[in-house]
Structure formats: structure tokens, C-alpha cells
Amino acid sequence: MPTYRDQAVVLRTHKLGEADRIVSMLSREHGKIRAVARGIRRTSSKFGARLDPFNLVDLQLVQGRNLDVVAQVECLHPYSAPLRQDYSLFTAAEVMVEAADHLVPVDREPAPAQYRLLAGALRVLGQGTTDGPRPPEMVLDSYLLRSLSASGYAPDLVDCVRCGTPGPHQGFSPSLGGVVCINCQPPGTPHPHEETISYLRALLVGDWTATRDVAWSRVREGSGLVAAFVSWHMDRGLRSMPLLER
């Protein structure tokens, strides 16, 4: 049977039979992969904890008719252990991998941008940014905005998303997909602080330096807007979102 190698982030695992697991991964070159890790639930398994969710791994797989089979695996970055030790980090990581699973709906369809965003977000979540550590809420919201943007759902945070009138604008409509002018605002449109919109723009482009001195009230307000935006633009929503301590 043909084999291949790839690097991947482990998204989730499911029990299979008495000793095996099906491992879902987002890979660098092959998109989303589902593969069987045989004997992984035995104490003598050669895989150990290397295929735990959130880990970044290098692996060799054997192509199968329905599911591939994991032949070898090396853990490049064991993100799982530190993220599981802190509830806020763990729940943020859970939302990230669930979002990645939704945004790459088809197996074996290359999604290099989504892979890079997820791997980078998990690294920042566990190790901090080049400008120092950031709260998990901030890292998660940046990932959600950027991954949705890579899938074609980028929010417009400058000009009116409906008519194109140049900003700045006070209204933000999650359903329309961004800021709206006073003439285009649907009933009940929230009016976040202008610093919150500027903060979201920084998250969207990954400008961590610009987030250094953001007030916590702006972070919390931004998280609410991102959560509403995600619920509108992901068809099934994210089941892990209610676990977040927002």
C-alpha cells in the first residue's frame, strides 16, 4: 500500500473497537485527514500521547480505501499538555480545533492557510506572541477572525459593509458582516466603542503590538462581537463556544 508523510495538527479522536482510535487531523499538504491509530488505547502503544488533540505532529501514513492508517508519528510540539492544565487555554483551543474542522469541511482538500493559522494560534496560545503573552480570549478572537477571513468571510471593519460609505462608523452588524453606516443599520444594531473596532482590526491582521495596551473592557466587548459574527457565518455554530468564560 502507498505511504506518505505530512505534518498535521490533531483535531480530535474517536474510539474504534477495543484498542484503536480514529484520529482527525488538519495537515499541511493534504488538508483534513482521518486515520486509524491501531492499538493506541493499549498501555504498551508506541504512539503514547503523541496523537492527543492540539499536538503538532510529523507522521507517516498508509493510504487505505476508506481510512488511512498511522504508521509512524513524531510529536513536533506537544501543545496538548500545557493547554490542558489551564481551563481558559483548553476551552480556547477546543473552539479553535472545532472551527478548523468546520472551515475545512472536505477531507483531503489542501487548506494550507487554515493549517498555518491553526498551528500558529495554538503556538501563540501556549507560548505567547513575539510581543509577549496575550489573554486566551484575544488569541482565540484573532484566530476566529483570520480563519473566517481565509474562508471568504472577512468582516469589513472600515467602510459600511452594505453601501460602502467610507468609515469610521459606529454600528456593527454581525449578520451583515461588519460595520454599517447610520443609514444602513438594521434595528437593534450594537454600537461598540471606536477603540473596540480598532482593536478588532488589529486582531484581523495579527498586529500583536497594537493590542499591547488594550483595555480589558475593549477585549470583552470585542469578544462579544466576534462570537456573534461567528454564530452568523458558521452554518452549524460551534458547540464548544458556550464553554468559554466570556
UniProtKB/Swiss-Prot annotation:
GO biological process, one term: double-strand break repair
Keywords: DNA damage, DNA recombination, DNA repair
Keyword DNA damage part of the UniProt annotation: yes
Matches recorded under InterPro entries: ARFGAP/RecO (IPR037278), DNA_rep/recomb_RecO_N (IPR022572), NA-bd_OB-fold (IPR012340), RecO (IPR003717), RecO_C (IPR042242)
Protein family: Belongs to the RecO family.
UniProt function note: Involved in DNA repair and RecF pathway recombination.
Protein name as catalogued: DNA repair protein RecO
Organism: Cutibacterium acnes (strain DSM 16379 / KPA171202)
This protein's encoding gene: recO
